[in-house]
Every structure is written in structure tokens, then in C-alpha cells.
């Protein structure tokens, strides 16, 4: 079966036509409730084995709050809680994604729940993952697991029963993505293109400084050793400062080899980030180490972050040893 993506306007039209007086939650002013017409619900559903779990991971990366295997009847209470309690506003989460399949309790109540959400003015959309019967059979055979609706019968029987149960939901879906010929990376790109209009083009970068004397980091994609630079610890006027203080930063960055190292490392990171974006890796951690994690590594981390931000990258910085002092 050929790859296919379908975009429909059913969900958006229903939200637009909702009564104006039902589009705002009630709450105390201190709770800062989220207006219902500013809240979004996404249902992730489709054929078992078509990629729902991976789709949920991608949607979570897009900023949605994801709940797996949620009974449809709990959607309304959950939306009400996230809007009227103010928790959505405080956390910045205004988008709820629920993974629902035919095994969810009270699946037959879904149509009524969707109608209720439409009446409330909540923008509700459906992402449906599909694949051909032949591909689904191959996928199940490769993992040697039974289909959830197989019930001791043939695998194809379970697939056909599920396809029949999901017919109406597929017709209502805003996006139908056929994953028959898609790899995991291609599915990710397809989801970004369908839901955001473009694929993931940047990688979020976190840089942290550390001290080798306190142990090597275990969660870094890159580790830079800057102990080749002169150590400000041995300069009495700089010892009690950190790499975030200008005198220390000036001392470190003006040292022989600092600029050349940063130039080369910046270029290497740029090349790697371009490749990571193509390989569907959206988060990269860079560790920069010196002896105690107070001076050289901090100054170099801050400067590397400044350079990468100049390229439009989303970069955060932290100091692992910030609570340790008097360390070289």
C-alpha cells in the first residue's frame, strides 16, 4: 500500500461553531483558568502495530501532555481538571493528547465524548495511524506477539475485526497516516510535517560544566576536556570567583588555545547537530570539564552556548558543580 496522508477539517469546524458562552472555564482569579477554546485535545488512535506509540513520543516532543490508554469517558473530567484548576496555565500545558485503542474501556462511548467536547468549544482533532494488513501481519510476526483482538484465532481475524471497529473513527480523523512504507524516522518527519507544517530542523542543546575530580558524566553525547588551559584557581584574585564572573571569563577565553579550541569545537558541533536533526534526534547534551568544574569549564560552556545561540539554536546551560567551591 502506498504512503498516504489525509488532512480533514472536521474537528476545527466543530470547535469554531461552538457557542461563545461555553468557551470559558469558571475558576477563581488566582487559579488563572485556561479558556476552553484555547485548549486542544488530540486523540492518537489507529491500527495496532501501525505506530501509535512512536507517534505519541513525537507528539510529546511537540509539547503535548500525553496520556496513554485513557478510557474515553475520562477525557471530559481530565480536560475539566486541566482547565478549571489552573494547572494548565501554571505549567504552560494547553494541549492534551490521549492514546486510545479498541482495548480502552468503554471505547463505544467515544463518539458521545467527542460530541461533548465539540459542544464545549474544545478544539478536538484525531490522528489515525494505519498500515496495510500485509504489513501489520509481518510486524506482528516479527515481534511474535498476538494481536489484542486475536483471541486465539488467526492473526488476520484480529486485524480485520479491529479495522471494522475503527472505520467510523478513521472517517472522522483529521490526519490519516499510512505507515506501511515508512521507517521510524520517516514517520517522525511525516508527523511533524502534518501537524506543524514542517519537519524538525533544529536540535535542543544542553551544555553543562563539570569537574573531573567529581566523576565523569554518564549522560553526555559530547565531552570536552579543557584542562589544557591555564587554571584560574592558582590566581589568588580569581580563586573565589567562577567562570561566570567576567574576570575569570576574560582570563580563560584570552588564554592561548581557547579561541582555536572553541572555533574547532563549534564547527564540529554544528556538523553533528545537522546530522542529528536528520536522524530524528532532538536533544543533545554537551559536557565541558575541567578539574573542579568552577572556572575553565564554566567559562568555556558559557562561551560555547553564546556561539551556538548565534546560529539560532535553542541552548541551555548549567553548572554541575555550582554548589561546590574552593575546587581547582
From Swiss-Prot:
Family: Belongs to the RapZ-like family.
Biased composition (Low complexity): 13-29
Protein residues bound to ATP: 46-53
HAMAP family from the UniProt entry: RapZ_like
Signal peptide range: none
Sample GO molecular function, one term: ATP binding
Pfam families with a match to the protein in the record: PapZ_C, RapZ-like_N
Protein name (Swiss-Prot/TrEMBL): Nucleotide-binding protein BL0705
Reported function: Displays ATPase and GTPase activities.
Keyword ATP-binding: yes
Region described as Disordered: 1-35
Positions in coiled-coil regions: none
Alphabetical keyword list: ATP-binding, GTP-binding, Nucleotide-binding
Sequence positions that bind GTP: 101-104
Lineage: Bacteria, Bacillati, Actinomycetota, Actinomycetes, Bifidobacteriales
Amino acid at each position: 500500500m502506498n504512503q498516504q496522508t489525509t488532512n480533514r477539517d472536521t474537528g476545527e469546524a466543530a470547535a469554531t461553531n461552538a457557542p461563545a458562552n461555553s468557551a470559558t472555564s469558571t475558576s477563581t482569579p488566582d487559579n488563572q483558568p485556561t479558556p476552553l477554546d484555547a485548549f486542544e485535545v488530540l486523540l492518537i488512535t489507529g491500527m495496532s502495530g501501525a505506530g501509535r506509540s512512536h507517534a505519541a513520543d513525537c507528539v510529546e516532543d511537540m509539547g503535548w501532555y500525553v496520556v496513554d490508554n485513557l478510557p474515553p469517558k475520562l477525557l471530559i473530567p481530565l480536560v475539566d481538571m486541566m482547565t478549571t484548576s489552573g494547572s494548565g496555565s501554571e505549567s504552560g500545558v494547553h494541549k492534551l493528547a490521549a492514546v486510545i485503542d479498541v482495548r480502552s474501556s468503554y471505547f463505544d462511548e467515544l463518539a458521545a465524548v467527542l460530541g461533548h467536547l465539540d459542544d464545549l468549544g474544545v478544539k478536538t482533532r484525531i490522528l489515525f495511524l494505519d498500515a496495510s494488513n500485509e504489513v501489520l501481519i509481518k510486524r506482528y510476526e516479527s515481534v511474535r506477539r498476538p494481536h489484542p483482538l486475536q483471541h486465539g484465532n488467526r492473526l488476520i481475524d484480529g486485524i480485520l475485526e479491529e479495522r471494522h471497529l475503527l472505520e467510523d473513527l478513521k472517517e472522522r480523523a483529521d490526519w490519516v497516516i499510512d505507515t506501511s512504507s515508512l521507517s521510524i524516522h520517516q514517520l517522525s518527519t511525516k508527523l511533524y510535517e502534518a501537524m506543524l507544517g514542517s519537519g524538525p530542523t533544529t536540535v535542543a542543546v544542553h551544555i553543562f560544566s563539570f569537574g573531573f575530580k567529581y566523576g565523569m558524566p554518564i549522560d553526555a553525547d559530547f565531552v570536552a576536556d579543557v584542562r589544557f588551559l591555564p587554571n584560574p584557581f592558582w590566581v589568588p584574585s580569581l580563586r573565589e570567583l567562577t567562570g561566570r564572573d567576567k574576570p575569570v571569563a576574560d582570563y580563560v577565553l584570552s588564554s592561548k588555545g581557547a579561541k582555536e579550541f572553541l572555533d574547532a569545537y563549534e564547527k564540529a558541533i554544528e556538523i553533528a547537530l545537522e546530522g542529528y536533526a536528520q536522524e530524528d534526534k532532538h536533544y543533545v547534551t554537551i559536557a565541558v570539564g575541567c578539574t573542579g568544574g568552577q572556572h575553565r569549564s564554566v567559562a568555556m560552556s558559557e562561551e560555547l552556548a553564546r556561539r551556538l545561540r548565534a546560529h539560532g539554536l535553542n541552548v541551555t546551560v548549567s553548572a554541575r558543580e555550582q554548589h561546590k567551591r574552593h575546587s581547582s
